[in-house]
């Protein structure tokens, strides 16, 4: 197989949660442990940083990576989902995994993958560990895929675990209360390690404290020590930056200082290519893309909207099945012109599903590019266009813009 055929096999032949939903989710560590053993890999031969939580995992991984790069370390990152290219998920510094490595890996291990019945995510994680091990990264930053306790990434023994925050998402799998969700996330806390918690929550703090006591693990709540320093005018990114800084400090790196931290924050785009977090993709009118897809995310973007001056606001939304749309759109300004579209995946909410979720009539077009063109035609140069609801909208809209 060439690379295009290999990528197609990975994306379309393996059970893929992002495309198919919970039917493709394969919880548990038995199969991934078998896979790692078949690959002759060891789950503790790298210096791991394990990042979980509901929101902010990806940006936290990116800021940790950027700061460590400025300290002259070779840093691997494993994140999800990807926006434009599968290879975004596996990087060393800001260099995507080589196509040739992916093709060779799948060719060599295809029969093992099929015999074990591995999911897309399990294969991707095995690929990442193989790549980082071969390239002898100094640190490997691993983002949890879903939950924590039963996530494929939970076979690692990290130097430090991070839980950014706890909010409602994937409730059909993780549970429908914050306490149940926190219990799943707390599964990444390992014995005699460290835990960094980004945001305090009176409903979940004790769960993390008790788990850390059981594991003889040190716990740090970032909000107790972060101070008043503002690194970004995007509030939720500022929280994630503080979490990233405390994570890097917990590694006790002698060369780490305030100047290196400052450079890491300033050079985030150069070092990591971070995208999808209140990303400006057009001007006159201002066009923003944000990957918010749950209540906490929509609350954050509503806060950002309140800081911007504009004439009218146009919001293009696309969702995967299972989203409680009323609980999300209630955060948006009352005078918003709201449009809905479909995503080009089988999990996309349909027109009928969107209509049945809302009390008022909706403007809908199943073609993202067409409705985006319509919005741009109707908007004046002083308006704001916001695209959000799912990372799957990014590729369609970004290419069109």
Q: Which role fits each region the language model picked out?
A:
Residues 61-108:
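N-terminal phosphate/diphosphate-binding loop that engages ATP/GTP or pyrophosphate donors
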Residues 200-220, 286-287, 326-384:
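C-terminal helical cap/extension that packs against the catalytic core
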Residues 159-160, 173-180, 185-188, 193-246:
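Internal gly/pro-rich beta-alpha loop/helix module
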Residues 390:
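Active-site-proximal loop/hinge segments that shape catalytic or ion-binding/gating pockets
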Residues 64-69, 132, 251, 358, ...:
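Hydrophobic alpha-helical packing residues
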Residues 45, 134, 139-144, 152-162, ...:
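Nucleotide phosphate-binding/pyrophosphate-handling subdomain across enzymes
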Residues 1-53, 60, 66-71, 78:
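Short functional linear segments
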Residues 113-120, 124-199:
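Flexible active-site lid/hinge loop adjacent to a nucleotide/diphosphate
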């Amino acid at each position: 197989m060439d690379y295009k055929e290999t990528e197609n096999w990975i994306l379309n032949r393996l059970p893929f949660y992002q495309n198919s939903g919970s039917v493709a989710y394969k919880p548990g560590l038995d199969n991934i442990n078998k896979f790692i053993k078949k690959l002759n890999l060891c789950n503790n031969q790298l210096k791991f940083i394990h990042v979980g939580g509901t929101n902010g995992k990806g940006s936290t991984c990116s800021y940790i990576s950027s700061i460590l790069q400025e300290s002259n370390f070779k840093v691997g990152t494993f994140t999800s989902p990807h926006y434009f290219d599968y290879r975004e998920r596996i990087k060393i510094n800001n260099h995507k995994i080589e196509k040739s490595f992916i093709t060779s890996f799948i060719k060599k291990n295809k029969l093992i993958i099929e015999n074990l019945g591995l999911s897309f995510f399990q294969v991707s994680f095995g690929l990442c560990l193989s790549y980082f091990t071969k390239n002898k990264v100094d640190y490997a930053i691993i983002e949890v895929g879903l939950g924590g306790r039963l996530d494929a990434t939970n076979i690692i023994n990290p130097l430090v675990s991070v839980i950014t925050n706890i909010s409602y998402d994937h409730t059909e799998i993780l549970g429908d209360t914050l306490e149940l969700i926190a219990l799943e996330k707390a599964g990444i806390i390992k014995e005699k390690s460290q835990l960094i918690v980004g945001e305090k929550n009176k409903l979940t703090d004790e769960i993390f404290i008790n788990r850390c006591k059981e594991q003889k693990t040190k716990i740090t709540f970032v909000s107790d020590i972060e101070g008043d320093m503002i690194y970004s005018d995007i509030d939720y990114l500022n929280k994630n930056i503080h979490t990233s800084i405390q994570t890097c400090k917990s590694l006790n790196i002698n060369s780490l200082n305030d100047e290196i931290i400052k450079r890491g924050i300033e050079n985030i785009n150069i070092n990591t290519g971070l995208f999808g977090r209140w990303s400006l993709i057009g001007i006159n009118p201002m066009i923003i893309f944000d990957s918010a897809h749950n209540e906490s995310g929509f609350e954050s973007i509503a806060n950002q909207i309140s800081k911007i001056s504009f004439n009218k606001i146009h919001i293009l939304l696309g969702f995967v099945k299972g989203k409680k749309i009323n609980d999300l759109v209630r955060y948006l300004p009352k005078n918003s012109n709201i449009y809905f579209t479909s995503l080009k995946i089988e999990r996309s909410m349909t027109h009928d599903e969107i209509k049945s979720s809302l009390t008022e009539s909706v403007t809908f077009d199943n073609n993202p590019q067409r409705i985006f063109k319509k919005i741009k035609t109707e908007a004046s140069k002083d308006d704001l266009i916001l695209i959000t609801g799912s990372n799957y909208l990014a590729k369609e809209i970004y290419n069109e813009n």
